[in-house]
Amino acid sequence: MTNTSRNRGIGIVTASDSQERSKGQLHIYDGEGKGKSQAALGVVLRTIGLGICEKRQSRVLLLRFLKGPERPYDEDSAIEALQRGFPHLIDHVRTGRSEFFTADQVTRFDIGEAERGWNIAKGAIASSLYSVVVLDELNPVLDLGMLDIKEVVDSLQNRPDGLEIIITGRAAPPSLVRISQLHSEMRPRSTGDLSKTNGQRRCNGGIEIYTGEGKGKSTSALGKALQAIGKGISQDKSHRVLILQWLKGGNGYTEDAAIEALRESYPHLVDHLRSGRDAIVWRGQQQPIDYVEAERAWEIAKAAILSGLYKTIILDELNPTVDLE
């Protein structure tokens, strides 16, 4: 995962003074890799959590292009978890047909559905009703020529102050990227065919790694937690989640509110543990307590993995912990 926002150094920074707290940004999740819609839902959860913590309403519109109701999508279960957990804060609209098509296969129906979705988006942007508007798969709609790019860019650039816009999908137009405050690119990284065992597709779990210099890795993981909880809801059985954080012993991180919102809505499905000091850990300046905390969290992780209690375990900031030895 890469992005165009400027990083502030090595280590973990308490986020209370971070620009990620600011509102009204335009986020773009782009690229060939998976997880773009999942990351957007993580941002939605964070926004709802911040609204709860600050005792203000943070209403969200999830507007999905090119995702008709004829087939299920990976993020459907996460959206169900959001709607059940925060029923008065989420509006959800789907447009388009579900099958894949190319630019030379665009029909009048496709254009009409794209225009219907964009008209809903414009109304939502102008309404002052929403804190966040998610325009899922808007990028490929623009790439297919189904909407006028200049009109979309002008409307988004002139959005009301305080309104956060999240756009997902491959092939983001350069003119849209230029007006964004955060552009994250998801890139697939091959590690061999881990999805198959003895010629059969493996369906019972796996390992997903979110890495890179860009922001949004923890947010993407929260989207995965939502997806896991939603699967448990739809299958009418427990799908317990453990969120275990390294290098985050303090308070004020951007995902804190999202995790708290999850725990309040699904107290029997989400466990959360954190480790480390409330400080940046620099290479060559590690303190004994850093090693103790890292080992403590890893022992908890191993026990959780072996326990059979959890269907999803998020090991947040494990990568830099290992990198710092």
Residue positions per predicted region:
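Extreme N-terminal, non-catalytic leader segments
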Residues: M1-Q25, N198-I207
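Conserved P-loop
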Residues: S22-A126, G206-S307
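Short acidic/polar alpha-helix capping motifs at helix-coil junctions
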Residues: R6-G9, I120, E137-V141
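Short secondary-structure boundary segments
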Residues: R64, R94, E137, G169-R170, ...
